[in-house]
Structures are given as structure tokens and as C-alpha cells.
């Protein structure tokens, strides 16, 4: 692929693609990032709805001694994190650009071949 891109004069696109590939996290890292981002969102939603997570054993002890759960409004600071979906979109755009360039050069090669014969 790299040799083909260089032969077609697509060094800039190749460099951009290689940069995107080098920055691309592994599938496991990406899933961990998504999980880490979902967890605070889930906790935030639960706090806004007045739901608090407690281990099952503690809940049972509270019921045994006649204690009730307190539902309070949780306050949480909003932390802005980069959206991994936008990074994926950028990679997809680079892939589309490269494919477009390859298709265009193939058309030009086909045209030159037809003209030569």
C-alpha cells in the first residue's frame, strides 16, 4: 500500500494515514475508554434521578435494622472529555480520501492505457 501510494504521488495522504494509524488506540483501549466515559455518565444519571448504588449486603443489613435509604440529589462536576466517535470519523474521512485518490489515479491510468492503444 505504501509503495503504491508513493508511486502515485500520494505521499501527503500516506503520511496522514500513517499518523492516524499510529495514534489509533487498540480495540481494547478504545473499549476501556468508552467504559470509563459511560460509567460516570451512568452514575450522574442515577444521581440526578435520586438512585444510589449500594452493595447488596449493606442493603440487607439496613432492612434488617429498620434503616431506610436516603435519596438525595447528587452534585457532580461536568468534565468535558474528547469524544472517541469524532476521532473515528476523522480516521474514516482519511480512509475515504485515500480511496478516492486511488480510484482517481486508477481512472487516469485506465484512460492513459486506452489512449495509448
Curated annotation (Swiss-Prot):
Residues 75-87 have a biased composition (Polar residues). Component of the acid-soluble and acid-insoluble organic matrix of calcified shell layers (at protein level). Residues 27-72 have a biased composition (Low complexity). One of its GO terms (cellular component) is extracellular region. The keyword DNA-binding does not apply. It is found in: Secreted. Residues 27-88 are annotated as: Disordered. Keywords: Secreted. This is Glutamine-rich protein. It comes from Haliotis asinina. The lineage of its organism: Eukaryota, Metazoa, Spiralia, Lophotrochozoa, Mollusca.
